[in-house]
């Protein structure tokens, strides 16, 4: 059996786990939480019928999943050269030739096309926001800023914060102050989250010549930046006062807990990675708790 035939067989047998890696399903799932919360809050706060809104919510979630997965697949296509250098990326199907470039591009553009159709079927603003997210993530982040500036994480935070806007607009048809507040939560959250991850992988990024802030400016500078974003995030819950004082207080306590963790002192440089890991884990829990809390509190207003 020829080497080419064996490779062809491998490519045709990409399993579900590998497909999840290609479309970065973990990242997609994380972004679906604020997308759903945006749609749910639009239903509750603008007095839409929940039952009649279910088809819209499901179509929004499907469309969002497809455009995010497609954009991530395209990111994997473009990043193959640096992924081959970074040890943590060696199991990606794009690195070990489990999928051809042609099939990867077909998957990517196919998902994004169908996803955009879903969003435009909802309304034009949802489709436009989806396009903005795709263009921002693929071009401004993946192709340009990721490889050229330490501001890459902040630049990537703009398209990364689009999901709650799509969720809200899918129901209401236009952006409101509440939708902007949800956008700001995700926008401010991302630098803290990804800087923590970058601290853990700073040597890998340096090896691949990717100008992540910890690799270029060092730990202290990155920690200061994370603290600045924590301070910016602190008053954002006040914009969601429509959810009630209880929500604002709980969300603020959640922010203060993160700030307290960020101010943790340590004696050894080896503790930097441990601190970054703790900040990273808190960030994962933060996003879930914040938006689940918003949904629960909004439910209480219906009682």
From Swiss-Prot:
Transmembrane segments: 25-45, 54-74, 104-124, 125-145, 151-171, 179-199, 227-247, 248-268, 280-300
InterPro entries reported for this sequence: Protohaem_IX_farnesylTrfase, UbiA_prenyltransferase, UbiA_sf
Keywords linked to the UniProt accession: Cell membrane, Heme biosynthesis, Membrane, Transferase, Transmembrane, Transmembrane helix
Pathway: Porphyrin-containing compound metabolism; heme O biosynthesis; heme O from protoheme: step 1/1
Compartments, as annotated in UniProt: Cell membrane
GO molecular function, one term: protoheme IX farnesyltransferase activity
GO biological process, one term: heme O biosynthetic process
N-terminal signal peptide: none
Chemical reaction(s) catalysed: heme b + (2E,6E)-farnesyl diphosphate + H2O = Fe(II)-heme o + diphosphate
Record's bilayer topology term: Multi-pass membrane protein
Domain of life: Bacteria
Catalytic activity, EC: 2.5.1.141
Function: Converts heme B (protoheme IX) to heme O by substitution of the vinyl group on carbon 2 of heme B porphyrin ring with a hydroxyethyl farnesyl side group.
Similarity annotation: Belongs to the UbiA prenyltransferase family. Protoheme IX farnesyltransferase subfamily.
Other noteworthy facts: Carbon 2 of the heme B porphyrin ring is defined according to the Fischer nomenclature.
Subunit structure: Interacts with CtaA.
NCBIfam families: cyoE_ctaB (TIGR01473)
Name of protein: Protoheme IX farnesyltransferase
Organism: Staphylococcus aureus (strain bovine RF122 / ET3-1)
Name of the gene encoding the protein in the UniProt record: ctaB
